[in-house]
Structure formats: structure tokens, C-alpha cells
């Protein structure tokens, strides 16, 4: 009998470890952290900073009826035109009366939803979950956003931001999937955003930035035609904003403040916003003009033009080096 052949033991094939690319755990963590940060806001009351005029003593939102809804969309109120924001207050009052908790709850809920949309948009755009995590955490937890969430009247900020990013997501889906329905949704959501706050008109140039980042030819006929309805809506609501502010004398005459001073103050606001984003200090709900009319401007305000000049040179450098990711992030 021949000797049995020794059987070579089979090597165990190590199964590759599957990476869990599901963002659900990150999303839960980000939203949980944001909720914890804003828990104190549930106890906030109505402030005499516009909350009385816009909410508790606003005669057009106390009763939910057709006449009041028509009034919200057809008239200026308190020097502004944001009917969708006032309509959301009307709905809150029907649900919880004038209890501040219901208004605070809605603000926080909208902020959470927008934080989620930012996560989705950034991941959709860059396909890198770590960038989406950082961006959504910064938005959800940064001190500069506390005013918009914790102050009832600033509902217009959290509401317009929600529709703004929802519109961006829809437009980006239109670019990737080439389906017209996403374009229609982007336009509709943009309209909802400007009906919440006029600042949403910034979406129109943001779409051009998105086109550039996605490699589209900006002078292409189709690309130009796509932007016409967005810019038309933006111009219309820009005019409405000027008219609404003029109705209460909120727009100063040209000779009230020299154009050079206006430019310097704009640069100062730009510089301080960047600085407070990096190092949030001395935050306030109200930032008055630094000097009385006719007085000279302190040197620090003239120096605030330097960050704007530096930003221009930085953008030129980024474009020259074709660092499109950084250029897009900076401009966005």
C-alpha cells in the first residue's frame, strides 16, 4: 500500500473588511450635537427686537384665513417683504398660540433640516464625506448662527436657508442627471427662498459658480437661457426690497453718507464677518455705524479694505494654479 499523501492545509482567505460608507451615523451625530447646542433656545421668550411687531402684535397672522394670507403676499409689512416667513408664523400661532416654545421649536427644526441639506449638498458635490461632516458641523454649531435660530423674528434666515440649499441640491441633480424636473424644482425652491427673505437672490450668481465648477461653458446659449428665470426673479425681488425699505424711509439719501464711507463700511463688515467666523468674539444682534455723520472714520476702518484686496489676489492665485476646489469653496 502506498503511503497516504499529506494534505496541504488550505489557507484561509481573509475576507476584505467592508468599509461602512453609510453616512447615517455621522448625520445622527451631527444633528444630535446641534440639538444639544440649541436646547437652551427652547426657553427663550419673545424679544422687543422686532418679535412684538412681527409676531405678537402683527394683526395679519393672528387668524388663519384667506384675507390675511392675501394681505401677506400683496403688501409690505414693517419695511419688508417676506410673506412666506409671516405665513409660517401664522401656522405656528394656530398650532400653539403665542407660546414662544412653538416658534423656537420651528426655528430649531428648520436649522436642523438645513444642516442636513448642507451635508447632502457638500457630499453630492465633492463626494468626500469628511468635507460634508466639517461643513455641516460648522453650519450647525457655529456661534454666528445662534442669532438666526434663537431669535424668533430671524425665522426668515433659517427658512430662506432651507429652501436655498434645497434649490442648490435640485440644480446639482439637474446637472448630473439631465432631467428637467430637477430644474423646475430648483426654480420653485428658489422662489420659496426669496419669498422667505430677499437675501436669497444670491442663489442666481451661485448657480453660475456651480456651473463653472462642474465644467460647463458659461457662455453656452443653454447655460445662459437657464439663468434668465432665476435672475428675473432675483431682480424683481430686489426691486421689491428697495420699495419696501423706502416705504418706511429706511434707505438713506445719497448725501447722508459719502460713497467712499459706504465702501469702507462694507469692507469693514466683510472683514469682521471673516474674522468672527474664524474667532467668534464680541458677537451682537446690533452693530451700529462707527461714527456720527460728518465725523472722520478711524484708521482701523480704512485698514479693513486690506482683506478685500488680499482676497482678490488670493482668488487670482487659485485660478492661476487651477485649484478649483479651493476657489469654489472660497467664493461660495
Model-flagged regions — what are they?
Residues 2-332:
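Polytopic membrane enzymes that build or remodel cell-surface glycoconjugates and lipids
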Amino acid at each position: 500500500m502506498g503511503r497516504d499523501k499529506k494534505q496541504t492545509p488550505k489557507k484561509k482567505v481573509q475576507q476584505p473588511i467592508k468599509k461602512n460608507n453609510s453616512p447615517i451615523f455621522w448625520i445622527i451625530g451631527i444633528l444630535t450635537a446641534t440639538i444639544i447646542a440649541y436646547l437652551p433656545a427652547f426657553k427663550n421668550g419673545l424679544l422687543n427686537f422686532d418679535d412684538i411687531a412681527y409676531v405678537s402684535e402683527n394683526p395679519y397672522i393672528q387668524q388663519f384665513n384667506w384675507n390675511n394670507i392675501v394681505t401677506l403676499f400683496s403688501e409690505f409689512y414693517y419695511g419688508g417683504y417676506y410673506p412666506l416667513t409671516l405665513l409660517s408664523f401664522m401656522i405656528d400661532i394656530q398650532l400653539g398660540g403665542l407660546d414662544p416654545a412653538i416658534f423656537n421649536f420651528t426655528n430649531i427644526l428648520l436649522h436642523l433640516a438645513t444642516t442636513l441639506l448642507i451635508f447632502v449638498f457638500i457630499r453630492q458635490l465633492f463626494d468626500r464625506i469628511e468635507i460634508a461632516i466639517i461643513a455641516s458641523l460648522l453650519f450647525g454649531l457655529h456661534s454666528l448662527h445662534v442669532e438666526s435660530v434663537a431669535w424668533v423674528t430671524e425665522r426668515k434666515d433659517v427658512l430662506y436657508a432651507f429652501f436655498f440649499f434645497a434649490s442648490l441640491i435640485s440644480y446639482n441633480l439637474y446637472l448630473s442627471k439631465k432631467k428637467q424636473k430637477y430644474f423646475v424644482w430648483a426654480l420653485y425652491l428658489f422662489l420659496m427662498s426669496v419669498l422667505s427673505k430677499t437675501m436669497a437672490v444670491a442663489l442666481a450668481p451661485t448657480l453660475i459658480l456651480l456651473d463653472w465648477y462642474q465644467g460647463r461653458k458659461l457662455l453656452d446659449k443653454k447655460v445662459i437661457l437657464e439663468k434668465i428665470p432665476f435672475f428675473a426673479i432675483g431682480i424683481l425681488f430686489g426691486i421689491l426690497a428697495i420699495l419696501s425699505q423706502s416705504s418706511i424711509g429706511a434707505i438713506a439719501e445719497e448725501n447722508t453718507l459719502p460713497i467712499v464711507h459706504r465702501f469702507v463700511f462694507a469692507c469693514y463688515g466683510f472683514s469682521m464677518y471673516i474674522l468672527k467666523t474664524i474667532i467668534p468674539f464680541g458677537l451682537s444682534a446690533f452693530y451700529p455705524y462707527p461714527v456720527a455723520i460728518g465725523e472722520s472714520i478711524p484708521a482701523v476702518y480704512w485698514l479693513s479694505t486690506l482683506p478685500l484686496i488680499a482676497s482678490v489676489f488670493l482668488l487670482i492665485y487659485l485660478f492661476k494654479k487651477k485649484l478649483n476646489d479651493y476657489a469654489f469653496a472660497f467664493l461660495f
